[in-house]
Every structure is written in structure tokens, then in C-alpha cells.
Amino acid sequence: AQYAKENGITLIHNNTTAVLEGIYLKRKLKLPLIWHVHEIIVKPKAISDFINFLMGRYADKIVTVSNAVANHVKQSRFVKNDQVQVIYNGVDNAVYHEIDASSVRDQFGIAQNALVIGMVGRVNAWKGQGDFLEAVTPILQVNSKAVAFLAGSAFDGEEWRVDELEKAISDSPAASQIKRIDYYSKTTELYNMFDIFVLPSTNPDPLPTVVLEAMACGKPVAGYRHGGVCEMVKEGENGLLATPNQPAELSKTIQELADNTEKREQFGKASVKRQKELFSLESYIKNFSDLYKI
């Protein structure tokens, strides 16, 4: 509070539902509070209700990263609809853009004419690596030029998840066509190496940034129809979505893109256009600048 006073701070921005200090500052200094919500908290319900109660009572404006998050927050009896505003996260196109990835393919020992189906995500309980393997295996089995590529590590203490995943890969009938690496910092290179980007999250991801990054790199997207991806992907325009947690249906959407080079290119161009129009860093900054003028 002392710091806020001394530095002439006139507005508080609480980032994520885990940050509660803004309430104290708002009450002590009588400043407006913007609460920025990135998560969809369903369980435990008591925690969800408590956070919604605090937001409803103290936030002058609740900003959510997607309509999926906004709709979840609005379901609470503690929150008024006009308290909630959606501001999509932006992607920096100076970092994420189309590049020639032939050298990246060489680096990973992938043929230039291979069809690369990729996913990027932490190895945890719900990012869906198991569903990804289940969905891509039949495609790999009928197409010897297809390669499945997974990138991502586990949290410290959960390395067993990686061991399980590695075992699932080695046990796969298409093991020789599946490659997995740990966390890789130059994700732009990976997205550009992919022909199809897949988001197989088994729980609704509020706003999966990896999808926006892949779109910025000109990729068609396949995924499950829940969470924020439904706002990023316009079905039939820059991607295809399947019923959540149905790997066989997800497989069909990937297959549809795998079979049609023209559709992949068309969807990829549409991805770039859509990302720049709706999910750019510029629009993100402008939307917050306008909001800060309250």
C-alpha cells in the first residue's frame, strides 16, 4: 500500500484468480480493481464459489481471456454479467510467423516430404498425449510418410508421466514414425515444421496459446470442441474439431486434413489471417489501454 501511494498508482490489476492482494489494496486505497482471469476452476466447488464471490464483490471489471472463461464466471450468482469483459491474449508476430523449416526437419531427422502431425504441451494429466497417440496411430499405419511429433516435459516430480508416455510410444504399432522431445524453447521452429497442429486436451483449456502460436505460423488446427480453442478455430475455415475425449473422431478430423494438401494450405492461410485480426499483441494492448481509462 505504501509503494502504491508513493508511486502514484491509480489502478490495480489482479492477474489470475490466485492473486488476492488486490482486494486489500482496493479497500485500503479506494482504487479501482481489474481482475484478470485465465482459468476455469470447476473443482473444488467451494474454492470456485469463494473466488467468484470475491471477484463479484470487489472487482470493478473482471477480464477473462476467452468467452469460455467468461461464460463459466457468469454462471456464478455472485457475478453480474456487466462486470465481465473478454480480452483475448495476443501473440507476438515478431516471434511467431512463417519460416522455412527444412533445416528443422533435418535437425530432427524428418524427411522433407514427410507429413508431420504435431502437438506441443506439458506432459500432465489432461494435455491429451494419450489421445493424440490413439488418434494418429491409424493414420501412421496407412501412411508410411506420416510422422507424429510430440514436444513437452513434465512438472518436477511428475517425470513418471514421461516414462509412461515413452512406454506408450515404444509399444505403439507405429513406434518408428513417432518422435518425442522434451521442452524446446524455439517453438516457432516446431510449428513451422508441422503440417497439422493438434490440440488433444481432455479438459477444456481456457485459452490455449499454443493454438494461436501455431496459427501465426500458418498451420491448420485439429482438436476437441471445448474450451477456448472453439473461439480460435472457425470450423471448416482454419481447422476441424471433434467431440471431446473421442480419439477416433479426432483421428477422422486429422485424417481429413492429412488427405488434402489444398485444404491444409487454405486453412493455414486462414489461420494467419484470423490470428492477426483477433489475437494480435496490438489488439491486446489496445483493449487493455482502453480499459485502463475507466
Positions of predicted regions on the chain:
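Short alpha-helical donor nucleotide-sugar binding micro-motif in glycosyltransferases
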Residues: 4, 183-184, 190-194
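Acidic anion/phosphate-binding donor-loop and adjacent secondary structure
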Residues: 71-78, 82-83, 90-107, 113, ...
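Glycosyltransferase donor-sugar binding loop
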Residues: 91, 120, 147-163
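A short, well-ordered alpha-helix in the C-terminal region of glycosyltransferases
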Residues: 103-106, 249, 256, 263-278, ...
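A conserved mid-protein helix/loop that constitutes part of the nucleotide-sugar donor-binding site
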Residues: 115, 119, 124-138, 240, ...
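Nucleotide-activated donor-binding/catalytic signature segment of Leloir-type glycosyltransferases, i.e.
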Residues: 162-182
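Short hydrophobic beta-strand element within catalytic cores of glycosyltransferases
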Residues: 220-223, 233
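Conserved acidic donor-binding segment of nucleotide-sugar-dependent glycosyltransferases
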Residues: 235-236, 240-247, 256-262
